[in-house]
């Protein structure tokens, strides 16, 4: 039988361990480097002379909005790519190409809409996310420029998923490597060399994203790719696009609810601790994102293996892929937990040298990331549901942890505990523990049923 995946890997026959290594390592590097687009900005901004702490807090206010922009890329890309991978497993590449073409046009339409909205409602949005009279100056400087590069963000994040789902892991990694390395180079030049400050950080980011977007579109239009962008597929077909968006709802909810959570955290921290508390949360969020990226990358690398073999009805390879992926996720998360609990100041000093900000963030991070060792299980199970095309359970789990558990705790705990700031931060690990317990319980039952059904068929 001729397999219609990329020539780099054989998702149907290669050893699962070797496959996971080949796909996960580039995906992990891609996730880490991709995060550097924003994290590097914060690292440099936090060390701007005299105004670093307040400028960092201002950019931190922009993060929830940036998450919303990324969420729409997840809606289309992370919904369409697994479906394309499933059809490749069924030896139906023409349908997979049509799905990709529909997603490409959808991303363009979403990008234009988001750009107009961000520019038109910039001030009220920033005020909604708790920008103070001091921080809104820097928030507007960053967001005003970043909004203009929305289409580049959508193309890079959304369409790169279609490179990865074909097995072109190295090419997928190059997408973010090119842009992120350029961003790392341009940031100090624009921020300090041209004395542009926060504006320079935003400009460096969108230039870098633009180069990455060009790379993605060039590859998907070239000769090397299995699935190719074709003009005849640029017409929206509801029967192809809507199921992809339905599958993308889970990652969309996971990403967009992070924005809602940031709003809730900022509201409470602004009330009890002011700009210093919000600045601390900016740092904690940055460290948490950076810590979780390898897990996201590992499950992203494992997803094509699971999706392809699910489509090919190969239950044994699906099981091996999931178990190995989960073991790696849990091991990594445990190491991160130990490092954060023992050496919190090391992580905080990356973003600031302000004494007041360092003092609060150093004790807060130990609380905020107390249950991070369990998140490997959570993410592995949740991403495997997506690999199976099981949108309903994925959406429920995404909503359960953040909307049903975490957000109520953010508002309830300060009314119970005397230390209000501590109460806000401790909501995170409590929600993590409850969510992991629920996810693992549901997954075990569903996974057994899925394997049994595949064996029967």
Q: Language-model features: where?
A:
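Short alpha-helical transmembrane segments in multi-pass integral membrane proteins
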Residues: 1-24, 84-149, 193-249, 306-371, ...
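N-terminal transmembrane alpha-helices
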Residues: 11-43, 47-51, 64-83, 108-115, ...
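Residue-level signal for transmembrane alpha-helical positions in Major Facilitator Superfamily
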Residues: 21, 36-37, 76, 117-121, ...
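Transmembrane helical elements of multi-pass membrane transporters/channels
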Residues: 22-41, 145, 179, 208-212, ...
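Helix-terminus/linker motif at the lipid-water interface of multi-pass membrane proteins
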Residues: 32, 36-57, 126-133, 189-196, ...
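Alpha-helical transmembrane segments of multipass membrane proteins
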Residues: 39-43, 116, 124, 158-162, ...
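Small-residue-rich hydrophobic transmembrane alpha-helices
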Residues: 56-116, 153-172, 280-338, 342-344, ...
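Short runs within selected transmembrane alpha-helices of multi-pass transporters and secretion channels
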Residues: 146-164, 172-180, 201-214, 296-300, ...
């Amino acid at each position: 039988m001729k397999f219609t995946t990329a020539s780099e890997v054989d998702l149907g026959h290669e050893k699962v361990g070797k496959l996971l290594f080949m796909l996960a390592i580039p995906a992990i590097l891609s996730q880490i480097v991709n995060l550097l687009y924003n994290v590097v900005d914060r690292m440099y901004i936090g060390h701007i002379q005299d105004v670093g702490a307040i400028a960092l807090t201002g950019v931190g206010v922009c993060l929830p909005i940036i998450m919303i922009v990324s969420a729409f890329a997840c809606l289309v890309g992370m919904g369409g790519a697994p479906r394309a991978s499933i059809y490749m497993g069924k030896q139906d590449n023409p349908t997979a190409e049509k799905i990709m073409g529909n997603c490409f046009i959808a991303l363009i339409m979403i990008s234009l809409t988001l750009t107009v909205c961000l520019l038109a409602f910039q001030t009220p949005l920033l005020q909604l996310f708790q920008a103070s009279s001091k921080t809104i100056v820097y928030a507007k400087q960053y967001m005003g420029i970043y909004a203009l590069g929305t289409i580049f963000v959508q193309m890079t994040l959304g369409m790169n998923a279609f490179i990865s789902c074909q097995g072109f892991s190295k090419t997928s990694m190059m997408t973010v490597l090119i842009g992120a390395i350029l961003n790392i180079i341009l940031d100090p030049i624009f921020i300090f060399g041209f004395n542009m400050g926060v504006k320079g950080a935003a400009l460096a980011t969108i230039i870098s994203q633009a180069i990455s977007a060009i790379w993605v579109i060039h590859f998907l239009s070239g000769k090397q790719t299995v699935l190719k962008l074709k003009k005849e597929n640029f017409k929206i077909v509801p029967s192809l696009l809507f199921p992809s968006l339905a599958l993308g709802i889970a990652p969309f909810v996971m990403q967009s609810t992070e924005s809602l959570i940031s709003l809730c955290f900022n509201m409470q921290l602004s009330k009890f601790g002011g700009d210093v508390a919000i600045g601390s949360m900016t740092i904690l969020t940055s460290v948490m994102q950076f810590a979780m990226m390898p897990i996201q990358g590992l499950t992203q690398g494992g997803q094509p293996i699971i999706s392809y073999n699910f489509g090919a009805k190969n239950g044994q390879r699906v099981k091996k892929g999931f178990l190995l992926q989960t073991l790696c996720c849990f091991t990594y998360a445990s190491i991160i937990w130990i490092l954060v609990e023992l050496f919190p100041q090391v992580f905080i000093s990356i973003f600031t040298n302000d004494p007041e900000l360092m003092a609060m963030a150093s004790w807060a991070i130990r609380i905020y990331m107390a249950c991070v060792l369990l998140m490997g299980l959570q993410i592995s199970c949740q991403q495997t549901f997506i690999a199976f095309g099981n949108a309903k359970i994925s959406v429920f789990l995404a909503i359960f942890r953040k909307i049903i558990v975490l957000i109520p705790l953010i508002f309830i705990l300060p009314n119970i505990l005397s230390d209000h700031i501590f109460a806000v931060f401790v909501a995170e690990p409590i929600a993590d523990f409850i969510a992991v317990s629920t996810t693992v319980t549901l997954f075990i039952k569903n996974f057994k049923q899925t394997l049994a059904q595949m064996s029967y068929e």
